[in-house]
């Protein structure tokens, strides 16, 4: 059993931004955005029969350790193991129902977006081609093919794969499905907030991982609509803080995408999502690799929940920045659980070694 506070590491990366304590303005006073709370509500009505209404569970022991009340939304329990089911479901459903439906869909992804698109394409009877980087682990390729998609390996990065996916889409009369910078994707991801705040209306603070920003943008739209004083914090890693730089108008620092939280290591944030987050998010908090590793370990040991690095980033931020949240009712989205088993084993073993719970003995015995 972990002792109180033992998973808090280092000093704080930063304090809350200047807007964190300011009263939220009414959405009607802000410049128009490409997605609205009404869009999120309509998305929920459209997809709720085709996705999992995932549970939002209280974690009283962890909350007590941190001086707050804590709820965890288990998007790890979606059909494909992540929140990506939501946006993919809405986008593909609209494409399939359009007057001129495409011959199929194409996407570029090395992870959860690939599986979300593949799953819902098969459900809707659409052909799906997923372009993955050449370095994609075989386990991810196998899972995506197992959901009925054609996998094409092309490019050294997701950015290069995206170029090829768009070319394939044009050649085959397919629709290209962007992982986050699409109003329908944002609206679909935002349905997680409808469930979460309906299930636990006491929540007054949301902590949400941010890669391209689709999940955080969609959830912020609904949360601020329901309660303008609800705080919304995004979370990125210190190795890849692209969205934080974008919404602050700061130079984008050198990005490192080789991180345990690779699902949110996005170099190019969305235009649609950045505009929403710039207006609605209270701050974007940073976490480091040890924070993320420890969050994965604590969630597995104490909550019996397996989260991938990106999925655990929100909880990592709550532990690192607990002083910002003390006394509040905090909802954290565990946005994905698709972690490679070997990686999970490595992370758990490192945690046991760090906590002094594994010892190596070397015994020399005379023959």
Q: Where does each model-flagged region fall?
A:
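PLP-dependent amino-acid enzyme catalytic core
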Residues: 32-367
């Amino acid at each position: 059993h972990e002792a109180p506070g033992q998973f808090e590491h280092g000093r704080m990366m930063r304090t809350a931004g200047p807007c964190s304590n300011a009263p939220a303005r009414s959405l009607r006073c802000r410049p128009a955005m490409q997605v609205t709370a009404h869009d999120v509500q309509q998305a929920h009505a459209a997809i709720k029969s085709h996705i999992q209404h995932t549970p939002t569970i209280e974690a009283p022991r962890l909350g007590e350790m941190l001086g707050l009340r804590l709820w965890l939304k288990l998007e790890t329990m979606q059909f494909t193991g992540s929140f990506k089911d939501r946006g993919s479901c809405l986008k593909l459903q609209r494409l399939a129902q359009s007057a001129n439906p495409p011959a199929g869909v194409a996407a570029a992804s090395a992870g959860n977006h690939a599986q979300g698109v593949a799953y819902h394409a098969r459900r809707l009877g659409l052909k799906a081609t997923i372009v993955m980087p050449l370095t994609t682990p075989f386990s991810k390729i196998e899972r995506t093919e197992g959901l009925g998609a054609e996998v094409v390996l092309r490019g050294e990065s997701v950015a290069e794969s995206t170029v090829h996916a768009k070319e394939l889409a044009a050649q085959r009369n397919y629709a290209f499905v962007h992982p986050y910078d699409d109003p329908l994707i944002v609206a679909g991801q935002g349905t997680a907030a409808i469930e979460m705040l309906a299930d636990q209306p006491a929540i007054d603070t949301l902590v949400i991982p941010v890669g391209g920003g689709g999940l955080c943008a969609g959830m912020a739209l609904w949360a601020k609509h329901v309660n303008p004083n609800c705080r919304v914090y995004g979370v990125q890693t210190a190795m890849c803080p692209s969205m934080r730089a974008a919404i602050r108008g700061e130079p984008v620092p050198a990005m490192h995408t080789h991180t345990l939280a690779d699902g949110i290591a996005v170099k190019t944030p969305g235009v649609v999502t950045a505009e929403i987050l710039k207006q609605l998010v209270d701050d974007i908090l940073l976490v480091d690799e040890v924070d993320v590793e420890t969050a994965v370990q604590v969630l597995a040991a104490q909550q019996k929940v397996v989260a991938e690095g990106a999925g655990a980033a929100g909880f990592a931020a709550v532990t690192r920045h607990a002083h910002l949240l003390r006394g509040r009712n905090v909802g954290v989205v565990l946005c994905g659980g698709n972690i490679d088993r070997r990686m999970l084993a490595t992370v758990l073993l490192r945690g046991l070694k760090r906590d002094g719970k594994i010892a190596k003995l070397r015994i020399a015995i005379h023959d």
